[in-house]
A protein has these predicted regions:
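Intrinsically disordered, low-complexity terminal tails
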Residues: 1-85, 109, 118-122, 129-132
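Long, low-complexity or tandemly repetitive, helically biased scaffold regions used
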Residues: 65-69, 112-332
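Extended amphipathic alpha-helical scaffold segments
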Residues: 78-105
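Charged, long alpha-helical segments
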Residues: 98, 109-112
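Membrane-engaging insertion elements
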Residues: 102-109, 328
């Protein structure tokens, strides 16, 4: 693939089939949240339901019996969690596809200096020699505008994504802690991070997912003046490469862990079991169910925005690297 073809591949990579799946998941999550809110208001209504509420519920095809309304509310939350599970897969696939494109840009740079891309020994076998060659050659420098993500922000986005996804998945009793032991990932997601936590009841599900959802809330809109720069130095060049490679490993681990149909069935069966075991009248458990439904909208929004920001920032920056490489080839 030529440099021009690589640039076109990266530029065209903004929209994908994964975006369609992401929007479908977001739609299901929002519908489930609305269904829960309506059924929950009936199930928790103090005293007898007034005729106006009974009529409205009937028109909306909702039960007017409080016990049945509670079952509908719980089912809506379970369906929302199922859609959120699918959202985690769809966003991870979009992220992985992006990292594959961006790593090809670095591989193209390596080829220029006779350095083969080494996935097994990324740092010592590929990136460190590439950084030395690039710095010696004076390839990096000024850009036409602020189009290159600052290395520290790229790393922070990836760290937030890794931690956030680990905690979201722990709400389903699943873990990607094995990926945090990777030597490159450990440079970004630091201190041997673990998202694995015990799940005893729905309060644990809510707590873990709330933690993860908040960790994903990294600057929802990247600002060109704050997060980007109009030059590329060797530190940011290296930090971006490490961040992209770490992100590729994290997203791949998410897909492998979540992508098996039997894994989802087991996870959702456990969620259903927790709902069945939830004590009637336990206000803390009831509040957790409500918080899961309300929170899922915010968590899904954070995940979608961070996914878009990461893939967009990587696309912008990798495109600039290829432009520098193309200019370098023309000048020689």
């Amino acid at each position: 693939m030529t440099i021009t073809e690589l640039m076109l591949d990266i530029a065209a990579g903004d929209a994908s089939e994964d975006d369609v799946h992401i929007q479908e998941c977001l739609g299901h999550i929002n519908i489930s949240a609305r269904e829960f809110a309506a059924a929950y208001s009936i199930s928790e209504y103090p005293g007898d339901l007034p005729s106006i509420i009974v009529e409205a519920a009937s028109n909306a095809k909702l039960p007017t019996n409080k016990g049945e309304a509670k079952e509908v509310a719980n089912t809506a939350v379970i369906q929302g969690l199922s859609a959120f599970y699918n959202l985690m897969i769809a966003t991870a696939k979009k992220v992985r596809a992006s990292t594959e494109r961006e790593l090809r840009a670095y591989a193209a740079l390596g080829k220029k200096y006779g350095i083969n891309f080494d996935k097994q020994n990324f740092l010592t076998g590929f990136l460190n020699p590439l950084c030395k060659a690039v710095e010696k050659d004076g390839l990096l420098g000024k850009l036409d505008d602020r189009s290159f993500i600052k290395g520290k922000y790229a790393a922070r986005m990836v760290e937030n994504y890794g931690k956030g996804m680990a905690n979201l998945m722990s709400g389903y009793g699943l873990s990607i802690d094995n990926v945090f032991g990777d030597s490159v990932v450990g440079l970004v997601v630091r201190n041997n991070y673990s998202g694995k936590k015990a799940i005893k009841d729905l309060r644990d599900v809510e707590s873990n997912m709330s933690t993860g959802g908040k960790q994903l809330n990294f600057d929802k809109t990247l600002d060109k003046k704050t997060h980007y720069q109009d030059y590329v130095n060797i530190v940011d060049f290296k930090t971006l490469a490490i961040s992209i490679f770490a992100l590729s490993k994290i997203s791949d681990s998410i897909i492998v862990t979540l992508g098996n149909a039997s894994t989802k069935k087991t996870a959702m069966d456990n969620i259903k079991r927790l709902f069945n075991e939830a004590s009637d009248g336990n206000k803390r458990v009831v509040r957790s169910v409500e918080s899961i439904s309300d929170g899922s909208k915010e968590w899904s929004d954070n995940l979608n925005k961070l996914t878009s920001n990461m893939t967009g920032a990587l696309t912008d920056s990798s495109y600039e690297l290829l432009k520098l490489l193309k200019k370098s080839k023309k000048s020689k």
